[in-house]
């Protein structure tokens, strides 16, 4: 049995087949994060893009744990230059890892590293493990190809940004949930800062009105999958 743990903003931890995977590990500077760098351990890190609130503490965590980072080619090459083990991928590609299969999808956003380095295209990520499929959308606008993602993949859990301003807001995220046809929706990327404040109860009501389940996890909370 696997687990999804939410650590605030878009930072998500997965336990799959004995591996710990961190997605977008934003700890330092994240007022919602429930853990510190000192008690962070993992086997893999998945990055959706290079912005500081997603790239976060990747370098320190990867070095401390000798973890492999899974990312788009430009991000992976940048990390290679920092002495980090990284597996480079690109949009539409998939690859098998000990914990399951990872596929990168489109995301409509932008991507650069905190030092201004171009970081390639932003991505969403599909992770299949033990018959369960998780979709972490990263930072993205609503786009019609989400419907295609939903048609091609039976998604059990979709983690969708709802904070508006930089990403989808509530209404667009509800439409994304319709397109994806996921069983359970988990909101991310909201209430970290004032500019992305969102009413998660409103989001829950609107998701339930389209016949989907919504689980809004507080930082540190988890669900078994």
Where are each of the predicted segments found?
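Active-site HxH/HxHxD metal-binding segment of metal-dependent hydrolases
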Residues: 34-113
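Active-site environment of divalent metal-dependent phosphoester hydrolases
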Residues: 29-30, 51-56, 76-79, 93-96, ...
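Binuclear metal-ion centers of metallo-dependent hydrolases, dominated by the metallo-beta-lactamase
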Residues: 68, 80-93, 174, 178-225
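Pre-active-site segment of Zn-dependent metallo-hydrolases
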Residues: 13-51, 56-60, 110-115, 140-152
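Short active-site oxyanion
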Residues: 3, 63-68, 132-134
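Active-site neighborhood of phospho(di)ester-bond hydrolases with catalytic His/Asp-centered motifs
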Residues: 22-24, 42-50, 70-73, 135-140, ...
